[in-house]
Every structure is written in structure tokens, then in C-alpha cells.
Amino acid sequence: MLPLPSELQIQAQSIKQRFSELPVPPDLRDEDIAVLALSDFVSDMLLIHPQWLEELHQQPPQPQEWQYYSQWLSQALAGVQDEAALLTALRLFRRRVMVRIAWSQVLQTSGTAETLQQLSTLAESMIIAARDWLYQVCCRELGTPCNRQGVPQPLLILGMGKLGGGELNFSSDIDLIFAYPENGQTQGGRRELDNAQFFTRLGQRLIKALDQHTIDGFVYRVDMRLRPFGDSGPLVLSFAALEDYYQEQGRDWERYAMVKARLMGGADDPYSQELRQMLRPFVFRRYIDFSVIQSLRNMKGMIAREVRRRGLKDNIKLGAGGIREIEFITQVFQLIRGGREPRLQERALLPTLQAVAELGLLPEQQVADLSGSYLFLRRLENLLQAIADEQTQTLPNDPLNQARLAWGMGYADWAAMSTALENHMQAVRVVFDDLIGDETPDIGEDPSHGLYKSLWQDVLEESDLAPLTPHLEEAARRQLLATISGFRHDVDKRTIGPRGREVLDQLMPRLFAEVCPRPDANVALSRLILLLLSIVTRTTYLELLVEYHAALKHVIRLCSASPMVASQLARYPLLLDELLDPQSLYQPLAPSAYRDELRQYLLRVPEDDEEQQLEALRQFKQAQQLRIAAGDITEALPVMKVSDHLTYLAEAIIDAVIQQAWNQMVARYGQPSHLQQSEGRGFAVIGYGKLGGWELGYSSDLDLVFLLDCPLDVMTDGDRSIDGRQFYLRLAQRIMHLFSTRTSSGILYEVDARLRPSGEAGMLVSTIEAFADYQRNEAWTWEHQALVRARIVYGSPKLHQQFDAIRQQILCRHREDPQLQQEVREMREKMRNHLGSKQRDIFDIKADAGGITDIEFIAQYLVLRYAASEPRLTRWSDNVRIFESMAHYDIMSPEEAAALTRAYVTMRDEIHHLALQEQSSKVAADSFIAEREQVAASWHKWLAANDANVS
């Protein structure tokens, strides 16, 4: 054993002092002092439970003692009579055994592989013991879940990730998926429950038993987001539902996650065998599948962006050459060849690597390097986490913790340990780059010689610039030089360090080589400089633009085309990562893919870290909006598709925000008790306005109305029980808060809830009955106009049906035409007087006569006027399909419907493009003359015999 360095000797003296103050001071041995000096967690636990130290002396930890964990835990739970006692016993058992594992790890009486086995078996033992105890309790309270033949049904638990691979780290959360074999009902209870309800309640209680923080801490943070549909999916699924999901919707990343999936409890009963056989074809393909390399490369790129986004330096898990890259290397062979090579179907990493060597898929020396690096990194990770029982993979920067890790790893000092770490990570990176690594970046011809270099580093005259910009006027060249000079001056005032300066000197000549030949060189450069000033002290982003010449070209193209994109990139430089893959940049996601992409994006963020969750939502929105804008700029997306994509994106975010708010409220108060007997959450969100009409723009706010379905006198079922309707009010307030909180990435969306019954004077959340009553008896005509563009964007099936029925009933009312015509016209005149341009030389595309609002009012009037005789007119909430319906049902001529649609789409297109230019909707008075004349003619025909024509 190495002598303790000075930092740890000081720590040792402090520990001796603390233990000497115990009622019965223990006799501390040298190895005791070493472990206690290395781990605050161990010393804190032994000060609270000094009898555990005596146990360590009398029964020193053994490498194979994991075989007895289940037996020890059974003894610890033998006297447990209720759930509170269960929670206490589980937490104390975990702490006691974790102290033994940390002890053995520091003193190296167990090797790293044995430590990982101990940590994984401990978690598995506790999951299974808690499940079995709670299953018996639930059966007594609710009856036994059985299939249609009366056979009792078990809860099966898949351990994912490192738990599944038997490689759990010291302070890890656990990823689980719950399943049960067959549908059916409970038997022997006071009333029948279907199996889904039974297992959902059991699953909720199991998560609480493991995850809830009490005075004794917690057992494990439980993460259920890897289950089908993530947080928005059922907590527990039947085998049939699991099979349907993975066959029909399983994504590549879910396939990779399933490689390590392992049934907890090690059972070999028929149900366990059935589940394993069902999942195997999804994970391991029969054919050799090389497509996984690109998918894994994409995943690695996402992780690299995450490291940059969160500023994760010195991260031994996610950084280059870290643990994750070794896992990726191993998974490549499993996923490509695992279907044909059973030896590659191992869950644990080290045996899989050994199989890779035996099959000749990698040289033996590389496999030896990878195995050695893996064990080194995993020991370092465990020692790091054992300091304070915290889940971290970031190396410390304080001398005490650096000394702890260096000593624990067997090095005299931090410098020696860092050198060894660097060598290991470099060895991993070499293999990773060879196998999966980023495709060779296209850096183009090196333009850093000659005039482009001089243009950056020397003071040039206008005449010197002429050979590079023969297409520019003299004044434009002078402006270009002034812009460059001003940027140089600004850079000189920044602290960018020698490395930053070196990278900037590489970047600028390359950038000039792309910008100078452009006809809009001055515009492009001025916008690019805003971006460069925002990243000039962040060398990572400068390096990205140097290394990926294609990314630099995309930046120039997009910034030149749109100041909105340029200012977004300048405000949020992490969006530069989106430019690395031109295929995805100019091809936004499929409309149906936004929810799944967001779910995958949020999986990388700790579920209980609200700040990071808020940031991730905002960054996802910005990244997707950039991709939509890129498609818009390059005309890959027509105007209708731009709005469709912006609307699908908003709906995915609404879904995720509600999920977060729901989880937070349920954690605090429990669920409203009536949900145990109903489907869904008793909550719905109605999208009005541009969201309801599939017409969102880049900066649109969201018009939302919240509805609930909850009887009176319902309470929530948590420890801090509150009234059910109060729960839904707080849920809506929480949703508004999550949308509007300003983080470093701004707000998510402006949300306007004033279209709810009684507006700002009304309740934030209405019952469905109150909403219907208000619409029938109190709503003004303009509120019924708004209802034309309303649709449900989130909600339980029951509320969805109820809202649709109410909307149709209200819109199909018989209305007296002269009165309806007058009320619609008066509201339009009021809006025009309030919002119109009032300038003869200006036309406001949105608000002035002949513009978009007139078209919207015509559509709304026609629905309210004719739906009583033709209810099918209420089907759509968007203007284009409303006009199609008017033509289809012979209310409007096909020519007029097509002309109004053309006018509407043309003006909408211009508004999108003005937004990309950061300009308002006000244009020259002689714009859109033909379109305005068509709108005026239709307005005159349907609504305003005496209304002023548009000239």
C-alpha cells in the first residue's frame, strides 16, 4: 500500500478526531484510515453506524460475497410489516453493503470486474425483493392478476444498460422496463381490476420503494424512460403490446439499448423464456447489418454535441476515448454480426470483447488495450463516485479529490495518474476512429496562403482587395475592409488565449475564401461577424468550423440568406452542431418523428434535473427550427409544409412539457384518485389560433385552453393529498411556468391562455361541462369564430371525443345571417382600426383590408353560416381545407376557393420569408394587388356590401 500523500494525511487526522468522539471510539487500523480518507460516504456511514466497522473487522469483504446478497436481504426484510418499514430496511441494507463494496474496492481485495458484479447483484437483489414483497401486498389488497384461463400473472422486470450487463457503477441510476405476460383480471379482490391497472399500481409502488428520498436516503434513482413511448407510454406493457411496439416502431437506438437487457431475478420459467425469445429477433438480425455503423456514428455525434452543450470537460464516460466509446466499439460487432454469432450475444462487455478477439474481428493487442482501458476507467469511475456516493464522471479539479483518486489508482500524484489516463483514452480513441469514427472531414483546399491570409493578418488597402473581389464596387470593397478591421479590433479586446488565436488564424482565411467571391460579400460578412464575436472565446466552436469545411459553407449560406438564422446562431452557438450533417440539416424530420426525436433527446438529460430538462427542450426547439428554416431557405419545404413542421414541432414540445409538469405534480401530490378507474389523465389542451389552424410561424406564440375531467370531492393519492381540481389548476400553472421560464436558451414559447371561458377573469382550467355551458350560453360570436380554428392537441380519448362533440354542436348552431354577418364585420373593423397600418404607402399583410385576417374571417363566417345545414364543414380547423370543403359542398365556386387559397398561401409564404429576414409583415402599398382584389371581391360578396374596396 502506497503511503498517503500530504492531502490525505491531513484528511486522516480529521477522521481520527471525528471517530475518537464516538461513545465507544473504535481501534482504527492503517487500512481503515486509508479507506476513510478516500471516501466521505464511507466515513459518514460508519460514524452513523459504528457497528458496521466492527462487522468489517470481523467479517472482511470477500470477492464472491455477492452470492449471499439475496439471503442477507431476506433476513433484513423478515420482520417488515408495512411499506414504511420496507423503505427503511431497503435503504439501510443498501448503505451497509455499499460500504462493504467501497471498502473492498479501495483495498483491492476485489478486482474491478468483481466490484461491478457486486454492485449489479446488489441492485438486482433489491429490485426483486421489493417487487416480490409488494406483489404479495397488492394481491392481498387488490386480488391476484390472472389470464383468461385463471393462471396468475407475474411482473417481469428488464434491467437495461449497465444493470443489464452486470456492470453497474457505484452511484448509478437504474434503467428498467416492466412487463406482464397476458391481459386478464384480478381474482379474489373486492372488485375486479384489469391486469394493466394492477401492474401499473404495483410498478408505481415499486418505483416509490426504490426511488423516494426519505430520512434514510434512497435506494436507486429509477429511470423508466427506455420503455416503449417513454414517459408518455404506459408504465407496464403486456408481452403482446411490447412485441407490437418493437416490431412496428422500434428505433435503432432502442435496439442498441436492448442489447444489454436482462431479466431481473435470473428466472428460467416459461414466461421469462417467452419474453427473451420475443425480444431476440429485434436485437440481433439474421443478416450481417453494416447500417449500424452510421447509426452508432450518429449517436456518438449526438453525445459529442451533448458534451459541448453541457460543457462537460474531463468526462471519462462521454469524452473522447471514454467508457462510452469502448461500449460503442463492442456494440458494433454485436449488432452487425450478433445474429449469426451467438458468442457476440453476451450482455457484459469484457466477455464480448474476448469473443471479438477469438473471432478475429479485432487484433488481439487492440482487444487487450480496450479491456485494460475499460477496467482502468471503470475503477476510476467507481472511486470517483464512492467519494460522496454521487453520480458523476467528471474528474475533480480540487487537490484533495485529485489526491484521493491518484492514490486509489496506485499513482504517486495526480500528474502521473493523468498521464496514464491520457494513454488509455488515446488507445481507445485510435480504435474508435478506425472503426466508427467521424467521417473524414472535408476541409477543402487550404486557402491560408497569399492574400486571404494577408486580408486577415495585415492592414490592406482597397486596391489590394481588388484581385479577390473584382465583382465589387470600390465603395463595397472599402466597406468590406472596414468590417474586417472592426472585427480585428473587437477580437483584440477579447481574452481568447494562444490556442484560440491559433484556430482563429486558421479559420479566417478559409472564411474569406468562401465569402469574398459572393455578390453579397458585405452582407454575408457582417452577419457572420456577429456569430464569430459570440464564439471567439469558445475555441471548441472555432475548431468545429475549421475541421468541418462543409459546416463553414452551410453557416455562410444560411447567414447570408437570413439574419434571423444568423442571430439565432450568434445567440445559441450550440446550434452549429446541427450544421455537421447536411442531409439532416436541409431535410427536417418527418412530421411524425418529432415526438420520438425529442424523447430520445431528453433521455440524455437526468429526469430529475429540471434546469437541464428546460434547457434541453429549448435547445431542441431551436435546433429543429434551424432545420426547418434551412429547408425553407433552400425551398426544400413549401410554405404549407413549413407551417406543418413548425406545428408538429410545437405539439411534440407541448406533449413533453405536460409530461414533465405531470411528473412533478404527481411526485409532490400523487395522482387524482379517480384516474384509477379511467383511461388517460383527465386533462386536455386545446390549441387555438395558428396552432389550431396548422399555421404556426417561426415566432408564433401558442394559444392554449386547458380542460379537466374530474368529479367533485376527488383527492390525490399522495402523502401531501390535495383536492383533485386544485391538482389540475396547479398542473396548468406548472405548464405555463415551464413554457415561460427564461433560461440561458431563452423561453420555450409565449403562451396565451386568454381564449379560455371568460378570458382573464375565468379559471385557468375549466371542466369540460363548464366549457360546454360557456360556449352555449355566454360566448360571443368572435369566440365561436375562434372555435373554428380550435382542435385538441393533447388529451385523454374521452376528453378528445367530448371536445369534438361540443365544437361541432356549437359550430352547427343555426344563426340568423344578417346578425352573424354584422357581428363578424364589426369585429373585423374593430381589429383593423386597432392593428391596421394607417399609412397610405404601407400594406400590412396580416392586418390590413385584403390581407390574411380578411381571408380568415371569410372562412370562419362561412363555417358559422353554413355548418347547420352541412355539419361536415366543421371537420377542419385550417383555412385551406375549409375553402376546399366550401367548394366540395357547393357553397363557394371552385374558382373562388382556389383563388382565395392562392392568395392566402402566397401571403403566408411572404410572411415566413419576412420573418427569416427579421422584418415585420408591413410591405409596400403596391404589393399583392391581384391577391388583395380577390380578397376584397370575396369580402364584398359574403360579408360587406358597403365595405370599402381595396385598391
Swiss-Prot record:
Keywords: ATP-binding, Magnesium, Multifunctional enzyme, Nucleotide-binding, Nucleotidyltransferase, Transferase
One function term, GO molecular function aspect: [glutamate-ammonia-ligase] adenylyltransferase activity
Entry EC no(s): 2.7.7.89, 2.7.7.42
Catalytic reaction list: [glutamine synthetase]-O(4)-(5'-adenylyl)-L-tyrosine + phosphate = [glutamine synthetase]-L-tyrosine + ADP; [glutamine synthetase]-L-tyrosine + ATP = [glutamine synthetase]-O(4)-(5'-adenylyl)-L-tyrosine + diphosphate
Renumbered residue ranges of the record's region Adenylyl removase: 1-440
One GO cellular component term: cytosol
Keyword Ribonucleoprotein set for record: no
GO BP term, example: regulation of glutamine family amino acid metabolic process
Record bears the keyword Magnesium: yes
Span list, region Adenylyl transferase: 449-951
Domain of life from the UniProt record: Bacteria
Record-stated family: Belongs to the GlnE family.
Function: Involved in the regulation of glutamine synthetase GlnA, a key enzyme in the process to assimilate ammonia. When cellular nitrogen levels are high, the C-terminal adenylyl transferase (AT) inactivates GlnA by covalent transfer of an adenylyl group from ATP to specific tyrosine residue of GlnA, thus reducing its activity. Conversely, when nitrogen levels are low, the N-terminal adenylyl removase (AR) activates GlnA by removing the adenylyl group by phosphorolysis, increasing its activity.
Name under which the protein is recorded: Bifunctional glutamine synthetase adenylyltransferase/adenylyl-removing enzyme
Species the sequence originates in: Yersinia pseudotuberculosis serotype O:3 (strain YPIII)
